[in-house]
């Protein structure tokens, strides 16, 4: 059945509220539908989608559903058609009894916005009930002397239907003694009465049988009958009379069972049996005999069951008093039940979200519930509260509906579960309350990035580590949960020395363990700067970075490397020159060594292991300087052999040795003469001496020509390098000198004097060689390490410690640096007296040729053996570049002597203790020139 026009009016209000943006709850009206009772399940009631201004498909999308307060769901929503239909058979009499109008009210909830819309459905009565008498046999006793016109009440029929479908009329079967009169009460109930039309004669007819028919006004009408048996008795002049025509009593609903409510009382003036009055219920529903008891003798009415105001608040019944012969009268009894506060409030959850995300906006509805109290008046007035320290509040909706909404931002990391206590309290005395707990889980959102305990770390690993070794454990924490807290680790893409970081180290993405992918070499790589990123698995993922400095620790894996004297490529031994006039402390040469390691592993000490003449020479423990320990004697051999050991201070220490050959003579010719005198006068090879001499002369000529060409090339190269150094001098000016071991000057010296002419002393056949240039790797810049260990070891250098003079530590100075005159180069470009001389004119060249020819002649005579060292090129002190410290850049700026205040210097006075002999060499050269 379609909605009545009144429903259409509300529909108009609803549509108007949508157009104006006004919530439906603001309208005071309700949507009204009507439907007949006893319709089939699924019968159409109204187009709810249209009346709500929705499309049928939107009912499911927006969560539209019915909220009913009763226990039985009478109606349902057809989601496909958008209509309101019956959920089953509806019996109007069961729902509304005999109320004139039967309205069923419920609410429609739209869950997406938590809005409620009140709905009323009127149940239309149909004629589905037949009027029925409480008893099919009605017994009436009438005295035979009863005057005509006396009326006798009859039991009325009941019809649960209402309106025209209810009881409308009574009919009495035709007879000559009685007629029927119908009376209407205040509630429009029709009461049949039997009217005596003629005097009865008991002797004529003792019993009269009549039929009473009750009919309703339905279409078609329905009816039922009752049999009336009228018994004619002897004369009974008086009928019982009640003391009150109507009895009223008010009792609280919590009276105990068996409580006497009231007593009805009737008086019969007759005597004997005619005056004995009995009481009985006359007009009651089937439920009343179970609720109340009427004492037939005393007229007391008491309770058989407990009263419940919430179920029935008012009872109406009729009692009759009858004497012995059968005369009776009636009275009405009204029982009013008073409400007491015996029902606690009830909370009915309509909609509840058990879990909400922590980033839920403020004002979000998380629960919708209904409060009710079955009591009445103040006993039924309910208030609801929640604790004040929660980020929620209550908002009242229509009727007794409440919303629970958020008032503050939620944070799962602070509190992940809320136990919300709803306390509903009524207004009774004393008040009753009921608590309902709502457990609200706060769902996690990815709002916390992973965090490291520190923003940067320093990690150390010793070099020569095995591949795959674990270096460090990186850990990060994420305060989120589940996938949002799953952390993966990664290394930022970067390059180190032209190679990607992933070729050096790797990280386990799950555990954060950092692994070495290669064995590190301190001399090649000392530090790696890494950036570790921690990602969580949220959506979108969050990350944080941490910087990690990986330092490679040095190990003593490199032995000392001797830079000077360098080993000749032909296997010969270099020779150094010591004049016989040298005083004690005269600097003969200097052993220069470096160690690619750093710190204590690179601290070097020098020791004279073996000498052909013990006590003649001494080696500086930290400087490597070879000096005369005493004055040279005539008995000292011309050729002295020294074995010098260089050892670092690592654990375990590593060492290297070098063999030095020192010629004791004042000049090269003297060396040649002395060496020639040592050779035997004749030998097995004299027969080809002439051939050797010819070959030697030719060779010397070729060598001289090559020497001149090489000398010119070196000059050009030096000039070119000087230009480059001047251009780059500004870039190197800011580099601290402490960052270099001191090898650059040595390398420059070796590059300058790498071309040597060497005459072997071990072969009878003298020859010339051109050694290959020496190439020295540049040392890696390193920071000095602070150590407390002694520079000397207690095992290898014990005896050196005993002879080591105490040295006072002094601040470093720069007097060891080369002057312009001390830098390597040809003698012609230098003017100092302390520098070695080179042939720089024709006379010197002729002298060199003459000396070589003389040497060749002596070799042909078998009277001498020429020998040359790498430092002298096999020539005399006059023509050979006398090796002094001016030619070798000092590295002692990087040498720290533990426990002393001395800083190694290169001052000529400190080194030799006397003026250099370079000036004498120049004088000799001038004398020879004049002589020639």
UniProtKB/Swiss-Prot annotation:
Positions with biased composition (Basic residues): 922-932
Signal peptide stretch: 1-28
UniProt region (Disordered), positions on chain: 805-841, 902-932
One GO molecular-function entry: calcium ion binding
Alphabetically ordered keywords of this record: Calcium, Cell adhesion, Cell membrane, Glycoprotein, Membrane, Repeat, Signal, Transmembrane, Transmembrane helix
One Gene Ontology term from the biological process aspect of the record: cell adhesion
GO cellular component: plasma membrane
Tree of life domain: Eukaryota
Glycosylated residues in this chain: 419, 545
Listed CDD domains: Cadherin_repeat (cd11304)
Membrane topology field: Single-pass type I membrane protein
Parts of the chain that traverse the membrane: 693-713
Domain Cadherin: from-to ranges: 29-133, 134-242, 243-347, 348-452, 453-562, 570-682
Subcellular location: Cell membrane
Predominant place of localization: membrane
Segments on the Cytoplasmic face: 714-932
SMART domains with a match to the protein in the record: CA
Extracellular-side positions: 29-692
Keyword Repeat: yes
Job of this protein: Potential calcium-dependent cell-adhesion protein. May be involved in the establishment and maintenance of specific neuronal connections in the brain.
This protein's name: Protocadherin gamma-A7
Native source species: Homo sapiens
Gene assigned in the entry: PCDHGA7
